[in-house]
Design a protein with these regions (language model features):
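NAD-dependent ADP-ribosyltransferases
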Residues: 1-162
Length: 162
């Protein structure tokens, strides 16, 4: 990240109405943030007791992770050193789970029929914001370098029924 202090003192909005994907609630709810994982990854997360950055979870260098097909967003190498979070009611995490399942971006039909939801790890934004490695990049609500211990920060885990 080029300028980590740029967004350091940005206040959390109560709701983000510009988001058109969250029609039911009229925008992104900001009291919670979420990390979404496919079931097999969620099992590993629970066994480990922490959400780990990609370099820590997969034990591969950031340059290798950046070149993988699953890194379709052309993310910079520092991306792989952070645990990423979306707003609590955002579908972005489930979209990523489906993208990894299909090997491509899912259509709107695939996000309803045949949809495979991820396991959602919820955190209170204001608590996670106090994590010593939490930063704001102006794109994601929050991201945390290296690791988030579930025992210290998790608020709720939602596992889909099927």
């Amino acid at each position: 990240m080029l300028n980590p202090d740029k967004y350091k003192n940005v206040r959390r909005p109560e709701i983000i109405r510009e988001c058109t994907a969250c029609k039911t609630r009229g925008g992104c709810m900001t009291d919670l943030v979420c990390h979404t994982a496919p079931l097999e990854n969620a099992i590993s997360i629970l066994k480990c007791g922490s959400l780990l950055s990609a370099v820590n979870a997969r034990k591969l260098p950031d340059t290798v992770l950046q070149k993988e097909d699953r890194s379709a967003a052309n993310d910079p190498t520092d991306f792989f050193h952070y645990v990423m979070f979306s707003w609590g009611n955002c579908q972005a995490g489930d979209r990523l789970v489906m993208e990894r399942k299909l090997g491509r971006s899912p259509s709107s039909d695939e996000m309803s029929a045949g949809f495979t939801p991820g396991v959602r790890f919820y955190f209170k934004y204001d608590d996670l914001d106090k994590h010593p490695q939490a930063i704001h990049d102006g794109f994601l609500p929050i991201k945390v370098k290296d690791e988030v211990k579930l025992a210290d920060y998790v608020y709720m885990i939602v596992v889909p029924f099927e």
